[in-house]
C-alpha cells in the first residue's frame, strides 16, 4: 500500500494554472499533488555569443527552490555563493527537454529563458517543472505569433515528464516525498507526444533493479506521461 493510498499506476492530482503572473510572456503554476512549481517563460531578443549570426534561437532554463519549500529552511544558493550540483543538473535537464520540442532555426535569433521556482516540494519537482515549463513555453511562443514576430509557432510537439520507481518491491508511478525517501529505485522519464523517450535518469538506491522491473516502470511512465500530455492540452485549450 502506498502512503497516499494511490494505485501503483495512479498520478497525484494534477493542476495547471496559466497566466499566473502578469509580466512574463508565459507563466504557469503547476501542481503535482502537494508539489508546486512556478514556471515563467521570458523572451529575449538575443542569443548566447556562440550562436550569434547563425540565424538560430535558443531555449534554456533555470531552476531553484524557495528556502522554505521543504520541511526545514535551506539557505538561498545566492547566499552560499554558488549553485549546488543538483540545481545545475536539473536546470540542464529542463533545458534539454524543452529544446527537444522546438525548431530552433524557426525560432530565429532570440532566446526563451524558462525559470522554474519550486514553491513547495513533495517529490517530483523536476518532472513537474518540465511539464509546467512546456506550457509556459507554448504561451510565450504563441505570443510571438500573435505579435507577428513569427509566422508560426516553432513547436513541433509536446513534452512532459514523470517519475517512476520501485517502492517496497512494487513499481509505482509519480513518487511523492514519502515514497522517494524509501524507494529502492528512482527514475525520471521525459517523453514527447509521439511516445518517444527524450531522457531517462534512473538509479538503484536500495538494490539493483531487474529488466522486468525496468520494463514495468517504463510502461508506467508511458501511461503517466500520456495523462500529463492530456492535462497540458486541456490547460492550453482554456
Swiss-Prot record:
<comment type="subunit">
    <text>Homohexameric ring arranged as a trimer of dimers.</text>
</comment>
<keyword id="KW-0808">Transferase</keyword>
<comment type="function">
    <text>Phosphorolytic 3'-5' exoribonuclease that plays an important role in tRNA 3'-end maturation. Removes nucleotide residues following the 3'-CCA terminus of tRNAs; can also add nucleotides to the ends of RNA molecules by using nucleoside diphosphates as substrates, but this may not be physiologically important. Probably plays a role in initiation of 16S rRNA degradation (leading to ribosome degradation) during starvation.</text>
</comment>
<keyword id="KW-0819">tRNA processing</keyword>
<dbReference type="Pfam" id="PF03725">
    <property type="entry name" value="RNase_PH_C"/>
</dbReference>
<dbReference type="InterPro" id="IPR002381">
    <property type="entry name" value="RNase_PH_bac-type"/>
</dbReference>
<dbReference type="GO" id="GO:0006364">
    <property type="term" value="P:rRNA processing"/>
</dbReference>
<dbReference type="GO" id="GO:0000049">
    <property type="term" value="F:tRNA binding"/>
</dbReference>
<dbReference type="InterPro" id="IPR036345">
    <property type="entry name" value="ExoRNase_PH_dom2_sf"/>
</dbReference>
<keyword id="KW-0548">Nucleotidyltransferase</keyword>
<dbReference type="InterPro" id="IPR001247">
    <property type="entry name" value="ExoRNase_PH_dom1"/>
</dbReference>
<dbReference type="GO" id="GO:0008033">
    <property type="term" value="P:tRNA processing"/>
</dbReference>
<dbReference type="GO" id="GO:0000175">
    <property type="term" value="F:3'-5'-RNA exonuclease activity"/>
</dbReference>
<keyword id="KW-0698">rRNA processing</keyword>
<comment type="similarity">
    <text>Belongs to the RNase PH family.</text>
</comment>
<dbReference type="InterPro" id="IPR015847">
    <property type="entry name" value="ExoRNase_PH_dom2"/>
</dbReference>
<dbReference type="GO" id="GO:0009022">
    <property type="term" value="F:tRNA nucleotidyltransferase activity"/>
</dbReference>
<dbReference type="InterPro" id="IPR027408">
    <property type="entry name" value="PNPase/RNase_PH_dom_sf"/>
</dbReference>
<dbReference type="GO" id="GO:0016075">
    <property type="term" value="P:rRNA catabolic process"/>
</dbReference>
<keyword id="KW-0820">tRNA-binding</keyword>
<feature type="binding site">
    <location>
        <position position="86"/>
    </location>
    <ligand>
        <name>phosphate</name>
    </ligand>
</feature>
<feature type="binding site">
    <location>
        <begin position="124"/>
        <end position="126"/>
    </location>
    <ligand>
        <name>phosphate</name>
    </ligand>
</feature>
<dbReference type="InterPro" id="IPR020568">
    <property type="entry name" value="Ribosomal_Su5_D2-typ_SF"/>
</dbReference>
<dbReference type="InterPro" id="IPR018336">
    <property type="entry name" value="RNase_PH_CS"/>
</dbReference>
<keyword id="KW-0694">RNA-binding</keyword>
<dbReference type="InterPro" id="IPR050080">
    <property type="entry name" value="RNase_PH"/>
</dbReference>
<protein>
    <recommendedName>
        <fullName>Ribonuclease PH</fullName>
        <ecNumber>2.7.7.56</ecNumber>
    </recommendedName>
</protein>
<dbReference type="Pfam" id="PF01138">
    <property type="entry name" value="RNase_PH"/>
</dbReference>
Amino acid at each position: 500500500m502506498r502512503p497516499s493510498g494511490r494505485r501503483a499506476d495512479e498520478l497525484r492530482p494534477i493542476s495547471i494554472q496559466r497566466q499566473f503572473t502578469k509580466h512574463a510572456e508565459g507563466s504557469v503554476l503547476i501542481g503535482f499533488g502537494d508539489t508546486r512549481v512556478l514556471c515563467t517563460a521570458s523572451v529575449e531578443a538575443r542569443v548566447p555569443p556562440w550562436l550569434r549570426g547563425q540565424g538560430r534561437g535558443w531555449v534554456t532554463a533555470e531552476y531553484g527552490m524557495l528556502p522554505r519549500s521543504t520541511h526545514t529552511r535551506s539557505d538561498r544558493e545566492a547566499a552560499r555563493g554558488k549553485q549546488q550540483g543538483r540545481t545545475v543538473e536539473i536546470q540542464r535537464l529542463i533545458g534539454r527537454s524543452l529544446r527537444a520540442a522546438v525548431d530552433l532555426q524557426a525560432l530565429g535569433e532570440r532566446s526563451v529563458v524558462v525559470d522554474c521556482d519550486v514553491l513547495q516540494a513533495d517529490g517530483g519537482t523536476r518532472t513537474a517543472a518540465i511539464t509546467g515549463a512546456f506550457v509556459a513555453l507554448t504561451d510565450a511562443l504563441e505570443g510571438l505569433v500573435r505579435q507577428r514576430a513569427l509566422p508560426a509557432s516553432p513547436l513541433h510537439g509536446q513534452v512532459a515528464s514523470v517519475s517512476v520507481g520501485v517502492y517496497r518491491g512494487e513499481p509505482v508511478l509519480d513518487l511523492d516525498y514519502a515514497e522517494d525517501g524509501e524507494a529502492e529505485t528512482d527514475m525520471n522519464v521525459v517523453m514527447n507526444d509521439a511516445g518517444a523517450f527524450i531522457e531517462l535518469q534512473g538509479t538503484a538506491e536500495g538494490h539493483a533493479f531487474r529488466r522486468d522491473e525496468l520494463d514495468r516502470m517504463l510502461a508506467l511512465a508511458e501511461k503517466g506521461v500520456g495523462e500529463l500530455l492530456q492535462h497540458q492540452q486541456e490547460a492550453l485549450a482554456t
